């Protein structure tokens, strides 16, 4: 280890930055975040540094650096492109035992500034000892994507209870166990979702040692259209901490591969007219599992609030006083159209887009066909594969051109994606003659013609058999 990683308190203490360019500006902001009193010396400065000075956030001297400028400083940063000046600042700082950092010159530094992940009061510093700063920034980016921004609030909550916990548990091992349970459980998740007061109350109950079973929480998570890379950070985090996962047929294998390894998996798959577990039973199962104190992830394909019956499920949770979170997912219409090179709206072809279910609650397709048949719009049908003939006939009957372009996207966003293009008139024959598997989305509109020009995903697939043209 070439450097000792330490954190220095510079609150209200004088810090000097030599230089006024963009890099100096970044270093000044770094020092200001730690509440240092910053003085900047430069013969000329960028507009951002000048603004900091005009806002009285720093002291600014537009002049050349002099040896006397380092007097009474507790920390110095030199951020200029003048090699001899940087060396002078370093030597003077060393002679006066003042910590100094010279940007991009590790040999002239007595300390280096790491990349940081700021979740104050939690701060993570990453350093490559000046060897590979770009790599340090990449590592920082990975950490930024995995650590919830509310970690700081969790630390503050813990700080408020620290003395109480110390008083309750004299043994350090008992305290450690208490905090580990807190930081990895429902209390932490409530903080992350902004329910600070609930988390505070639950922490007090846990500290009091109540024997009452703590009610768990349900996470209604949108698993997206199939590609696991399209999951949100929050979705992934909740999937990996849930005790139980209820999932359905539309969740891809790639997404399922990311759930917590030891979680209990319950399949509640749904197919047309064949629900493995009836919706009412799913609703009640969510309630029962949460009342057992378990963290329950209800994992759905696409977005839970777009033809996903998510509203019905959380209605039941709300009626039973169960805490829940809803995490949006990329809906199939957005994911499948994007991965097929078909924009849902376009200035020249479509000024609106409608998402329509082809499988209504009563099993019929009682839709406003006149509204759906107007020009300059895109229609996306979910769950309509078996009703393709009916929707084709109805749209043509109500005025849509029989030659209107149509695309069917099977298993969209996955390596198994297939895209069939045809016309509205020929759609029934396509579905009849080809072996097309659910989940398949039907996109109708002039925007489909753009696929030939804008298709990008199929070109990345190894096989050329992923795209099909039916009926010329």
From Swiss-Prot:
<comment type="function">
    <text>Then it catalyzes the NAD-dependent ring dehydrogenation of precorrin-2 to yield sirohydrochlorin. Finally, it catalyzes the ferrochelation of sirohydrochlorin to yield siroheme.</text>
</comment>
<keyword id="KW-0627">Porphyrin biosynthesis</keyword>
<feature type="binding site">
    <location>
        <begin position="43"/>
        <end position="44"/>
    </location>
    <ligand>
        <name>NAD(+)</name>
    </ligand>
</feature>
<comment type="pathway">
    <text>Cofactor biosynthesis; adenosylcobalamin biosynthesis; sirohydrochlorin from precorrin-2: step 1/1.</text>
</comment>
<feature type="binding site">
    <location>
        <position position="383"/>
    </location>
    <ligand>
        <name>S-adenosyl-L-methionine</name>
    </ligand>
</feature>
<dbReference type="InterPro" id="IPR035996">
    <property type="entry name" value="4pyrrol_Methylase_sf"/>
</dbReference>
<feature type="binding site">
    <location>
        <begin position="331"/>
        <end position="332"/>
    </location>
    <ligand>
        <name>S-adenosyl-L-methionine</name>
    </ligand>
</feature>
<dbReference type="InterPro" id="IPR028281">
    <property type="entry name" value="Sirohaem_synthase_central"/>
</dbReference>
<dbReference type="InterPro" id="IPR050161">
    <property type="entry name" value="Siro_Cobalamin_biosynth"/>
</dbReference>
<feature type="region of interest" description="Precorrin-2 dehydrogenase /sirohydrochlorin ferrochelatase">
    <location>
        <begin position="1"/>
        <end position="203"/>
    </location>
</feature>
<dbReference type="InterPro" id="IPR014776">
    <property type="entry name" value="4pyrrole_Mease_sub2"/>
</dbReference>
<dbReference type="InterPro" id="IPR014777">
    <property type="entry name" value="4pyrrole_Mease_sub1"/>
</dbReference>
<dbReference type="InterPro" id="IPR012409">
    <property type="entry name" value="Sirohaem_synth"/>
</dbReference>
<dbReference type="InterPro" id="IPR000878">
    <property type="entry name" value="4pyrrol_Mease"/>
</dbReference>
<dbReference type="GO" id="GO:0051266">
    <property type="term" value="F:sirohydrochlorin ferrochelatase activity"/>
</dbReference>
<feature type="active site" description="Proton donor">
    <location>
        <position position="270"/>
    </location>
</feature>
<feature type="binding site">
    <location>
        <begin position="22"/>
        <end position="23"/>
    </location>
    <ligand>
        <name>NAD(+)</name>
    </ligand>
</feature>
<protein>
    <recommendedName>
        <fullName>Siroheme synthase</fullName>
        <ecNumber>2.1.1.107</ecNumber>
        <ecNumber>1.3.1.76</ecNumber>
        <ecNumber>4.99.1.4</ecNumber>
    </recommendedName>
</protein>
<dbReference type="InterPro" id="IPR006366">
    <property type="entry name" value="CobA/CysG_C"/>
</dbReference>
<dbReference type="Pfam" id="PF10414">
    <property type="entry name" value="CysG_dimeriser"/>
</dbReference>
<feature type="region of interest" description="Uroporphyrinogen-III C-methyltransferase">
    <location>
        <begin position="216"/>
        <end position="472"/>
    </location>
</feature>
<keyword id="KW-0489">Methyltransferase</keyword>
<dbReference type="GO" id="GO:0043115">
    <property type="term" value="F:precorrin-2 dehydrogenase activity"/>
</dbReference>
<keyword id="KW-0597">Phosphoprotein</keyword>
<feature type="binding site">
    <location>
        <begin position="301"/>
        <end position="303"/>
    </location>
    <ligand>
        <name>S-adenosyl-L-methionine</name>
    </ligand>
</feature>
<dbReference type="GO" id="GO:0009236">
    <property type="term" value="P:cobalamin biosynthetic process"/>
</dbReference>
<dbReference type="Pfam" id="PF00590">
    <property type="entry name" value="TP_methylase"/>
</dbReference>
<keyword id="KW-0520">NAD</keyword>
<keyword id="KW-0808">Transferase</keyword>
<dbReference type="GO" id="GO:0051287">
    <property type="term" value="F:NAD binding"/>
</dbReference>
<dbReference type="InterPro" id="IPR019478">
    <property type="entry name" value="Sirohaem_synthase_dimer_dom"/>
</dbReference>
<feature type="binding site">
    <location>
        <position position="412"/>
    </location>
    <ligand>
        <name>S-adenosyl-L-methionine</name>
    </ligand>
</feature>
<keyword id="KW-0511">Multifunctional enzyme</keyword>
<dbReference type="GO" id="GO:0019354">
    <property type="term" value="P:siroheme biosynthetic process"/>
</dbReference>
<keyword id="KW-0456">Lyase</keyword>
<dbReference type="InterPro" id="IPR037115">
    <property type="entry name" value="Sirohaem_synt_dimer_dom_sf"/>
</dbReference>
<dbReference type="InterPro" id="IPR036291">
    <property type="entry name" value="NAD(P)-bd_dom_sf"/>
</dbReference>
<feature type="active site" description="Proton acceptor">
    <location>
        <position position="248"/>
    </location>
</feature>
<dbReference type="Pfam" id="PF13241">
    <property type="entry name" value="NAD_binding_7"/>
</dbReference>
<keyword id="KW-0169">Cobalamin biosynthesis</keyword>
<dbReference type="InterPro" id="IPR006367">
    <property type="entry name" value="Sirohaem_synthase_N"/>
</dbReference>
<dbReference type="GO" id="GO:0004851">
    <property type="term" value="F:uroporphyrin-III C-methyltransferase activity"/>
</dbReference>
């Amino acid at each position: 280890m070439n450097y000792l990683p330490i954190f220095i308190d510079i609150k209200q203490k004088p810090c000097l930055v030599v230089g006024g360019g963009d890099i100096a500006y970044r270093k000044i902001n770094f020092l200001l975040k730690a509440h240092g009193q910053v003085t900047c010396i430069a013969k000329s400065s960028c507009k951002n540094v000048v603004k900091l000075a005009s806002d009285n956030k720093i002291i600014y001297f537009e002049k050349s650096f002099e040896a006397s400028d380092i007097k009474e400083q507790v920390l110095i940063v030199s951020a200029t492109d003048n090699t001899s000046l940087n060396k002078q600042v370093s030597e003077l700082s060393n002679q006066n035992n003042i910590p100094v950092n010279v940007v991009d010159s590790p040999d002239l530094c007595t300390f280096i500034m790491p990349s940081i992940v700021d979740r104050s009061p939690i701060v993570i510093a990453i350093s490559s000892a000046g060897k590979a700063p770009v790599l340090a920034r990449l590592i920082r980016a990975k950490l930024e994507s995995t650590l919830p921004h509310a970690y700081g609030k969790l630390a503050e909550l813990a700080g408020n209870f620290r003395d109480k916990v110390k008083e309750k548990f004299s043994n350090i091992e008992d305290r450690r166990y208490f905090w580990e349970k807190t930081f990895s459980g429902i209390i932490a998740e409530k903080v992350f979702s902004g329910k600070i007061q609930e988390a505070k109350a639950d922490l007090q109950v846990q500290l009091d040692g109540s024997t009452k079973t703590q009610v768990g929480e349900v996470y209604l998570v949108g698993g997206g259209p199939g590609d696991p890379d399209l999951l949100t950070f929050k979705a992934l985090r909740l999937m990996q901490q849930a005790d139980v996962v209820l999932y359905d047929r539309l969740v891809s294998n790639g997404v399922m591969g990311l759930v917590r390894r030891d979680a209990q998996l319950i399949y509640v798959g749904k197919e047309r007219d064949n629900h493995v577990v009836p919706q009412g039973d799913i609703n009640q199962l969510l309630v029962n599992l949460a009342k057992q104190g378990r963290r329950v992830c209800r994992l759905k394909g696409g977005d839970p609030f777009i033809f996903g019956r998510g509203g019905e499920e959380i209605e039941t949770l709300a009626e039973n006083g169960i805490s829940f979170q809803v995490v949006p997912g990329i809906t199939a219409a957005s994911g499948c159209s994007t991965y097929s090179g078909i924009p849902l709206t376009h200035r020249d072809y479509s000024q609106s887009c409608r998402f329509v279910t082809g499988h209504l609650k009563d099993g019929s397709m009682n839709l406003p066909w006149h509204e759906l048949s107007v020009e300059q719009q895109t229609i996306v049908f979910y769950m309509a594969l078996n009703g393709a003939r009916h929707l084709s006939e109805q749209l043509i009957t109500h005025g849509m051109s029989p030659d209107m372009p149509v695309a069917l996207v099977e298993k969209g966003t996955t390596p198994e994606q297939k895209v069939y293009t045809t016309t509205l008139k020929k759609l029934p024959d396509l579905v009849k003659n080809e072996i097309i598997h659910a989940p398949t989305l039907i996109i109708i509109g002039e925007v489909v013609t753009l696929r030939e020009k804008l298709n990008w995903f199929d070109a990345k697939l190894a096989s050329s058999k992923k795209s099909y043209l039916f009926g010329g």
